[in-house]
A protein has these predicted regions:
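Metal-dependent nuclease catalytic regions and adjoining charged, substrate-binding loops involved
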Residues: 59, 71-158
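Conserved catalytic cores of phosphodiester-cleaving nucleases, focusing on short active-site segments
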Residues: 20-53, 69
Length: 158
């Protein structure tokens, strides 16, 4: 049975300098804890992800985002028994659950520890396809104006 449901739960990993919001955390009566991130996509994106001609090398950034939240959930509850991405096709209302391997927790924790270490030495230079991995990430970055005034244009061909 479900004991508690948490929606849009704040996640703050002070030591890793990471903050976000977990879409859905479900805690069961037996103490087990499950984390879900809901991704709303259109029919075309859904076909590209799950159809016969799906992408050969899909991006893992959504898995890694969920894993960051997973680190926070595990710290808060003392355990995390599973984490999944829920893809909601907004055109058909179909939902598909994709379980994410728990090893991603180790991957993201190591990654963010390395980032904190690197930033402790000063603001690092941009590295295309590394930091940022995707151009859309810049919209959420506090240093966007620095990059815009710096040499960002040479990376994006703007």
């Amino acid at each position: 049975m479900i004991k508690n449901v948490y929606i849009e739960e704040p996640i703050f990993l002070e030591d890793l300098k990471v903050r976000g919001f977990a879409d859905l955390i479900i805690e069961l009566d037996d103490g087990s804890v499950y984390l879900y991130d809901i991704k709303t996509i259109n029919a075309w994106s859904y076909r590209m992800k799950f159809g016969r001609n799906k992408e050969k090398d899909p991006s893992i950034h959504q898995e890694l985002q969920l894993a960051v939240y997973g680190v926070g959930v595990k710290r808060r509850f003392g355990r995390l028994d599973g984490m999944s991405l829920l893809y909601y096709n907004k055109d058909t209302s179909v939902i598909k659950e994709v379980d994410i391997d728990m090893s991603r927790l180790i991957t993201v924790e190591s990654y963010w520890k390395e980032i904190v270490k690197e930033h402790s030495l000063g603001l690092p230079n941009l590295r295309p396809n590394v930091s940022p991995v995707n151009d859309w990430e810049c919209r959420y970055c506090l240093y966007k104006t620095r990059c815009d005034n710096d040499n960002r244009k040479e990376f994006t061909n703007e």
